[in-house]
């Protein structure tokens, strides 16, 4: 049997130096949106976490255009997740020969894109089914 399901294209950023909670605040706003709409949202956000996510979304779109030869207007973010990474541990020198430990949080961000042009015939049948159920 031939696998006709198109692959999902992803970009993975590991060990990004920011808190996972701060990155999740941005990711929750872009999940399920189109590629072009996501870029507009991320460009206008005043948060520091928006820039690494912007770079990952752009990288995932470049991966999709290279591997699938798909148009960027047809890309949709179907999955975006943030996981905690290992904490970077440093020592801060203090007075009288002492030191305080500093833990910098890191996170791993995954962006998964899907090309909706593969699903045009399926989406029409889904819309017809929804209209029938609404009646």
UniProtKB/Swiss-Prot annotation:
CDD domains: Ribosomal_L22 (cd00336). GO terms for biological process: translation. Keywords: Plastid, Ribonucleoprotein, Ribosomal protein, RNA-binding, rRNA-binding. Pfam families: Ribosomal_L22. One of its GO terms (molecular function) is rRNA binding. GO terms for cellular component: large ribosomal subunit; plastid. This protein binds specifically to 23S rRNA. The globular domain of the protein is located near the polypeptide exit tunnel on the outside of the subunit, while an extended beta-hairpin is found that lines the wall of the exit tunnel in the center of the 70S ribosome. Part of the 50S ribosomal subunit. This is Large ribosomal subunit protein uL22c. It comes from Cuscuta exaltata (Tall dodder).
